[in-house]
A protein has these predicted regions:
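Short, solvent-exposed loop/turn at the beta-strand->alpha-helix junction
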Residues: 108-111, 133-134
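Leucine-rich solenoid repeat scaffolds
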Residues: 117, 125-141
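Short, basic amphipathic alpha-helical segments that act as recognition/interaction helices
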Residues: 2-4, 10-12, 30-31, 42-66
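Short, positively charged interaction helices/loops
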Residues: 57-90
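Short Lys/Arg-rich basic patches
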Residues: 1-27, 36
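Mid-chain, well-packed structural core segment of small domains
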Residues: 89-95, 109
Length: 141
């Protein structure tokens, strides 16, 4: 049985969310506004988040199986300067595979990231300094 590494599945708070933009037709938008006016939802965002969570729940088994098959970290994974220095000392190159949020500490120099990170695959959000992202540009998928 494959190992599934759960880091954190807690929902992000406030500033930890990513903004997306969607295009809706006027009829769909009108129906959303009607449901908000009638008190079913507190606002448009509440309805959209609820709908997305419901769809994710429908497909939860597929997500779990795929995360296991792809050997991905589910949740949050953070790499500190010390983590990357330890990998460098051990002559290891990291393949980062995350469904959720992957982040590299702000104090990580681009040279260290380039020397220790072989690839980055993130389904979700990837936070790193612009210099680190530039150093890893050819390795981010």
């Amino acid at each position: 049985m494959a190992n599934l590494k759960l880091i954190s599945t807690s929902r992000p708070k406030g500033g930890e969310t990513e903004k997306i933009t969607i295009n809706l037709g006027p009829i769909d938008l009108g129906q959303i506004d009607l449901l908000v006016e009638e008190g079913f939802y507190s606002n448009r965002t509440d309805l959209i988040r609820t709908a997305i969570r419901n769809q994710l729940a429908v497909h939860a088994q597929v997500v779990t199986e795929t995360v296991t098959r792809r050997a991905m970290v589910l949740g949050l994974q953070h790499f500190s300067r010390q983590d990357l220095e330890a990998a460098q000392t051990a002559n290891e190159r990291l393949d980062i595979h995350v469904l959720g949020l992957a982040s590299i500490a702000a104090d990580v120099p681009p040279e260290l990231a380039a020397a220790t990170i072989a690839s980055v695959v993130v389904l979700g959000a990837f936070h790193a300094s612009p210099a680190v992202k530039a150093a890893l540009a050819g390795r981010i998928r």
